[in-house]
């Protein structure tokens, strides 16, 4: 019933089996015990609670970005909130990873050799200007700061508008705003968030059962 199947399929089959035993008990054998009522099985096939993420509004994100005066920080915030990049992906970027409106992610989380991120031309121009201003070599990191420093920068940016802000809130905003603007969920999933499956994107958008974001 369960081997080789996804957890959601397992839960559905468990529910069906439990309903079958209840039917037998109610119609044929009231003394029969439903084996699906065993606590260990109920715990194993328990459905996850729905998680409601706090989604940032567009005007809040715009204000955060516009009021961030440090060029490096502003570009990093835009890469997360406009392009849907993970903070770890932003920190790995080098000039060699930029190709006009395309950013190349090498050895991404998905396990592929590379993935592409698409950004507006105007934003691409500002990124190139920043790289030239810093005089960076092709393989130097564009944002040579630690993960902790980057998270702290995001939190500080959120305080500008009295919002508790985390890097993944910005990535989730990119997905939500695109979806609300009419972008098909398949495009949001494969192009913006680069998820392996659609169900992960649905959780981002609050349309499925919650789990840890990726």
PLM feature spans:
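Alpha-helix N-cap/helix-start motif at helix boundaries, enriched for small hydrophobics
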Residues: 17, 76-77, 84, 88-93, ...
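Short basic/aromatic active-site micro-motif
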Residues: 147, 163-182, 195
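Basic, Lys/Arg- and aromatic-enriched nucleic-acid-binding interface segment
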Residues: 58-87
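DNA breakage-rejoining catalytic core of tyrosine-based enzymes
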Residues: 44-62, 111-121, 137-138
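Conserved tyrosine-mediated DNA breakage-rejoining catalytic core shared by Y-recombinases
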Residues: 83, 88, 92-126
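Active-site/catalytic core of tyrosine-dependent DNA strand-transfer enzymes
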Residues: 120-163
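Short, polar N-cap/turn motifs at the start of nucleic acid-interacting alpha helices
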Residues: 98-100, 164, 183-203, 209-210
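N-terminal core-binding DNA-recognition domain of tyrosine recombinases/integrases
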Residues: 1-50, 134
């Amino acid at each position: 019933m369960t081997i080789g199947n996804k957890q959601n399929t397992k839960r559905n089959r468990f529910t069906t089996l439990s309903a079958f035993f209840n039917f037998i008990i109610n119609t044929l054998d009231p003394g029969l015990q439903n084996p699906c009522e065993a606590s260990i099985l109920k715990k194993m096939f328990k459905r996850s609670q729905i998680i409601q993420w706090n989604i940032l509004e567009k005007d809040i994100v715009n204000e955060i970005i516009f009021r961030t005066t440090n060029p490096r920080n502003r570009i990093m915030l835009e890469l997360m909130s406009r392009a849907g990049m993970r903070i770890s992906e932003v920190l790995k970027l080098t000039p060699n990873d930029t190709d006009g409106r395309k950013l190349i992610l090498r050895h991404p989380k998905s396990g592929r050799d590379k993935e592409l991120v698409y950004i507006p031309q105007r934003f691409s121009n500002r990124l190139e200007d920043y790289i030239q201003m810093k005089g960076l070599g092709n393989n130097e990191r564009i944002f040579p700061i630690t993960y902790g420093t980057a998270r702290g920068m995001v939190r500080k940016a959120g305080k500008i508008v009295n919002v508790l802000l985390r890097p993944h809130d910005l990535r989730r905003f990119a997905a939500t705003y695109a979806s609300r603007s009419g972008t098909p969920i398949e495009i949001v999933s494969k192009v913006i968030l680069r998820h392996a499956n659609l169900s992960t994107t649905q959780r981002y958008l609050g349309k499925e059962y919650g789990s840890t974001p990726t």
